[in-house]
């Protein structure tokens, strides 16, 4: 009894500590979420007050949007469309405001942690290796690296491409710049080394990582979402981020700055794919069927994938393992309750085929 007694005494303490830990984590998550919602609400309100309701534009997974000049000027990179649009409502010398915004956007660096997309802070650090280098060419077909070069191109754009439009009582001055046709490939190339490293470390196919990165962010390291998913692989701190930290023996969850670092983001996103592949959905025997399930789960969660087949987890695995892969794909792409997850499987699966070629 003497050896058992301490365990009996300690067990309730362990349960209590675990319960307290979970409670603290839940409270921290609620606090973070509420804080983010308040921040976003105030941010959108500030924009609406100046630009009007129909002109509210906020950064997203495939849209870089940065406000400056007390919210009167903004730069928008649409990574899907391959365009940069710089706009201002500043009535006092709008060309000067546009010129500075064009220069700052063309020369901004690769570190998303240095730029606050949820404020009107004017500071945008200029990099020796701009993020957009090679993705934008000047009027002579040359890539832009230096400040004098960006300034000359900005002057050319202001002389030849300045446009105006009216919204409500506001006049908006704008410049639109096209990215090069293969801008997506140029961004993807920046991260191939990181993808190879994560692929080898976690045993996840490179083509799957790249397909998910393209689907989630179009290789935009500044990617954010309304759900506060962050970075290239759109990792959510309190779910996938927390799961990966726990798997690595780390306390808590990754910070925003941690996930905005491209290498950390790719590592965390790939580690989560490995957890889906080897743990949460490891009961699926056929690798192709498991891949379909992993893709869908990265978007909508492993639990929702299994519930498509049965509410009982073991039974769900049995049903999936009794199906050919094509039937698993058909079931997930037509019967998953989330239309977004159904589209996600279709898109990632097709993109992965391209990356395998």
Curated annotation (Swiss-Prot):
Belongs to the transglycosylase Slt family. The gene is mltC. This is Membrane-bound lytic murein transglycosylase C. InterPro entries: Lysozyme-like_dom_sf, Murein_transglycosylaseC, Murein_transglycosylaseC_N, Transglyc_AS, Transglycosylase_SLT_dom_1. PANTHER family: MEMBRANE-BOUND LYTIC MUREIN TRANSGLYCOSYLASE C (PTHR37423:SF2), SOLUBLE LYTIC MUREIN TRANSGLYCOSYLASE-RELATED (PTHR37423). A lipid is attached at residue 17 (S-diacylglycerol cysteine). A lipid is attached at residue 17 (N-palmitoyl cysteine). Pfam families: Mltc_N, SLT. It catalyses: Exolytic cleavage of the (1->4)-beta-glycosidic linkage between N-acetylmuramic acid (MurNAc) and N-acetylglucosamine (GlcNAc) residues in peptidoglycan, from either the reducing or the non-reducing ends of the peptidoglycan chains, with concomitant formation of a 1,6-anhydrobond in the MurNAc residue. SUPFAM superfamilies: Lysozyme-like. Murein-degrading enzyme. May play a role in recycling of muropeptides during cell elongation and/or cell division. Its EC number is 4.2.2.n1. GO terms for molecular function: hydrolase activity, acting on glycosyl bonds; peptidoglycan lytic transglycosylase activity. Keywords: Cell outer membrane, Cell wall biogenesis/degradation, Lipoprotein, Lyase, Membrane, Palmitate, Signal.
């Amino acid at each position: 009894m003497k050896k058992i007694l301490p365990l009996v005494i300690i067990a309730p303490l362990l349960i209590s500590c675990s319960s307290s830990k979970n409670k603290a984590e839940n409270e921290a998550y609620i606090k973070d979420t509420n804080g983010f919602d308040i921040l976003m609400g105030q941010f959108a309100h500030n924009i609406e007050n100046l630009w009007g309701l129909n002109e509210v534009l906020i950064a997203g997974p495939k849209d870089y949007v940065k406000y400056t000049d007390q919210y009167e000027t903004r730069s928008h990179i649409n990574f899907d469309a391959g365009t940069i649009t710089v706009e201002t409502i500043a009535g006092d010398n709008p060309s000067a405001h546009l010129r500075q915004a064009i220069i700052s956007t063309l020369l901004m660096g690769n570190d998303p942690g240095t730029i606050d997309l949820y404020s009107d802070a004017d500071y945008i650090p200029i990099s020796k290796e701009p993020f957009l280098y090679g993705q934008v060419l000047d009027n002579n077909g040359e890539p832009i690296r230096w400040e004098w070069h960006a300034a000359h191109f900005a002057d050319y754009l202001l002389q030849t491409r300045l446009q105006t439009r009216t919204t409500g009582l506001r006049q908006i001055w704008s410049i639109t710049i096209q990215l090069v046709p293969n801008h997506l490939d140029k961004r993807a190339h920046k991260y191939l080394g990181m993808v190879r490293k994560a692929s080898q470390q976690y045993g996840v196919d490179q083509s799957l990582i790249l397909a998910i990165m393209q689907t989630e962010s179009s290789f935009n390291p500044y990617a954010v979402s309304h759900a506060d998913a962050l970075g290239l692989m759109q990792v959510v701190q309190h779910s996938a981020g927390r799961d990966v930290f726990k798997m690595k023996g780390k306390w808590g969850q990754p910070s925003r700055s941690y996930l905005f670092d491209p290498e950390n983001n790719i590592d965390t996103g790939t580690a989560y794919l490995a957890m889906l592949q080897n743990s949460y959905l490891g009961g699926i025997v056929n690798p192709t069927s498991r891949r379909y399930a992993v893709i869908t789960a990265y978007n909508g969660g492993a639990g929702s994938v299994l519930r498509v087949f049965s509410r009982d987890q073991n039974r769900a695995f049995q049903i999936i393992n009794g199906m050919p892969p094509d039937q698993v794909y058909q079931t997930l792409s037509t019967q998953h309750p989330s239309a977004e997850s159904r589209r996600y499987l279709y898109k990632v699966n097709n993109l992965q085929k391209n990356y395998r070629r």
